[in-house]
């Protein structure tokens, strides 16, 4: 056989093999399968009573296991209209949530066992997205005067609303924190930092946030948002990046304290501020 004939046969066989592989891919993921389908979770408002006392809240988020992507904000609100704690959500979210008090901690978690049945998912749905019709779709409401020491949102964006006095420790897994209509003595973020802190119609006397693997932007919507003193701390992490970005151009902060850690790997700090902000470098 001529050389050109061999080449033509090779091209034909190669095309045949590629066509077979393509068909196998189509068969393994047919059009009928919903890959990354978005489920909008909503329904009428529902309020669930919480009878046992607590001083900390943990959103025990076990949903990010590679199979589900759940997008809903977690809010904690202080209110004069309730005499006991409760959880406000929607009818469809309520079917997916469990609440339990252990010691001084209220645990709010997704009940993944009910997920497929409640949403009537097809068994072959791949990596579905659950999106809340209301952005802050899950809210724990506590009576005014109740002491709340800590909130751990895990994978959730966290909002504090209508707090009047007191100090709160807030932990998120590198998710944004929003403060709305609050007057607080202090907000402490103990471990992982937050990429964004939004302060709206609120005054916070003292904020402490670590700056390590994430940059930080602080945003005050207008003059009604004020942080009197904010301390940004470096971290002792080998894997932390050498350069940190601290954007305070839209923040109303009276005094900024930068406290690098003794072995802080954030060697260069890119800082953007407003005029008139006092800056203190607290070398430890």
Functional labels for PLM-detected ranges:
Residues 64-66, 77-92, 145-147, 166-169, ...:
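Extracellular beta-helix/beta-solenoid repeat scaffolds
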Residues 2-12, 19-94, 113-142, 154-159:
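Short acidic/polar N-terminal linker immediately downstream of export determinants
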Residues 92, 96-190, 194-199, 206, ...:
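Right-handed parallel beta-helix
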Residues 198-284:
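Short, surface-exposed interaction patches in beta-rich subdomains
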Residues 56-58, 107, 139, 169, ...:
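Beta-strand secondary-structure signal
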Residues 49-53, 80, 142, 181, ...:
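Flexible, charged surface loops at secondary-structure boundaries
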